[in-house]
Structure formats: C-alpha cells, structure tokens
C-alpha cells in the first residue's frame, strides 16, 4: 500500500490530484459546499438535460407504462429490445446512411471499433484525439503514427510513406476537439482519404452532434461530407441529454462490429428506458435551431473576450479554453471563479499538454447573454 500512497502524494505535490466532487444539480446551476454556482463546465450544450417541458412530454407519452429499466443482458443474447432497432434505423435515416449501431458510451465505441476492424492495418491519428481513441489504438496493437494537430501536410507525408505497407489505413480524428474547441477540416480529410487506396476515415463527433449543422447532425453535416466518412461516431451523452453512443457506417462494417467488437459483445446493453429517451430527443433534433443559433452568439462573444485577455484562442466552438499555463495559477483561478458563483473546473496534464493548463469553459443554450457578460467581468 505504501507504493500507492506515494503515487497519490506525488500527484498532490504536482497539483494533479483528483477527487469526485459532491454535487447537487439545480437546472443550469450546481450546488457544492452550500454554494450555488452557474455551471460553466457542462457538456449539456443545448440545455436539454434541464428542460422540464421535454421531460414531462416524454413521460406523458407512456402514461405510466414505461419501457424496461434494464436490458439484463448483452444484445447478442437476450438483451435486445425493439427500441434499439428503432433508434438505429432513425439515426441511419437521418444521416442517410446504410446503417447505425448503438454502444453504451462514447468510450465503449472508441475502445472497440478500431480493435475490431484493424487487422494488418495502419492507424494515423491526430495528435490531440481523445484518450478513448488513444486507448482504442493501443488495444488494436496496430502500427500507428500521430500526425501533428490538424496538420494535413504531415498526414499526407505519412500516407505517402506508409500506405503500401499495410492492407488498410485508418485516419482517426475528432471533428470538434474537446479541450481546445477547434475544428478539423473534414473536407480536406475526405480529399486525402480518396487519394490513397484502402484508406478509411474515422471521425468522432462527440462534441458536435446536436450543436452544428442545419439539422444538428454535426460538423460532417455542415461540411456536407457525411456520405464520405466511413465511421462517423457520436455520443448521446452531451448535447442530446441522454447516454450511449452510435456509429453510422456501411452495413458490412456494422456486421463486422457485431461479430468482433468486444465492448459490444460482452456488455449488458443500455436500459431500454434510456434508449427510448434518446429516440425522443434525436427525433426532435432538427427543431432545436434556435438553441443552436443562441449558443453560437454566446460562444462568439466569450471567445472574443477570453482572447482579449489571454491572446490565445484556438476555439471556433462553444468550448472555450481559458489557458493560464501552470497548474497552480489554473487551480487558483478556478477557485476564485467558484467563490464568485461560477462552477469552473481546472484542466491539467496529462489531459492537456504540460504548460497549457486551462479552465475549460463550455457554454449551454439555456444561458443568457447577460449571464455570460457578468461572468466575463469576473475573469
């Protein structure tokens, strides 16, 4: 036990010790230690999680005869329910693709897809892809390289040097990057993919689904490249106010995943009740255009104000990094903002590169411009 204790002491000395906070949620506010704070760290981008009207409308449609609260099994055994297929068909239809497949979480999706599909393959991943994608790459045991962040000339060089050595190549990226809030150029990635044989594009839209595109289908919809992305992954646990994840892809890839993806095969499926809620929200996704427009106005204002103070602004989205550099300064500023009534959280290495500790600000559509202006005055 002494070795574990020393590890924790070392983390504490480096200002990298983490703990799970005791929180009470009140709409867009957080109660912690008897302090009420506006939640500036939520991924509930459209503000749907606290929308009581939506919740009541969903519950009323069942009249007390709710779907099961557990699946009790893997979908490949006895845990499949009609609502799963209904949601997969709806997702595939909205994206105008052959098929969709559900997962228990975005993490499950990202650690399972690549190991299931990448035998004798090369993986080329953006340097800043999410930890879950890195874990999936490691589990695949494939040869892999990481290209410099959003540097497609570097990616092209790696493709030219390596593609002929492998049966298949997978380019892996996020569309909206979770810590910097910047956006991948999906059109350019599609063009690159098409230049090389047996090359597949895998895009994680976790922070884009619901928020971008005319119908809320993400950056791929906005860039008009949905049909060109081989594996388009998204989560229901952020803007869509639910849980779980999906991939849209060709039917043949779906069948391969069903047969070879261990997190899918060996996990108890999501509760049908939650999948029904996801269906309810996803069905209404095109209706939230006002929320998307309002969120963009709030985001543009906050990005401008933070850039004015730090001279650093990689973001193009509602994820706005307030980069302070060192751990101590970041922890102190987060504490100061919490004392002023704003629930802001410090993000430190190894989540972000050393020397780029920041407060990750994420806006939601249920905030007002006055609230954001009042927050800016505290920066």
From Swiss-Prot:
Residues that hold substrate according to the record: 18, 130, 351
Swiss-Prot/TrEMBL keywords: Biotin biosynthesis, Pyridoxal phosphate, Transferase
Catalytic activity: 6-carboxyhexanoyl-[ACP] + L-alanine + H(+) = (8S)-8-amino-7-oxononanoate + holo-[ACP] + CO2
Keyword check for Transferase: yes
Top EC class for this record: transferase
Cofactor: pyridoxal 5'-phosphate
Enzyme Commission number, as recorded: 2.3.1.47
Matches recorded under Pfam families: Aminotran_1_2
Subunit annotation: Homodimer.
Function, in words: Catalyzes the decarboxylative condensation of pimeloyl-[acyl-carrier protein] and L-alanine to produce 8-amino-7-oxononanoate (AON), [acyl-carrier protein], and carbon dioxide.
Protein's name according to its UniProt entry: Putative 8-amino-7-oxononanoate synthase
Origin species: Haemophilus influenzae (strain PittGG)
Gene that this sequence comes from: bioF
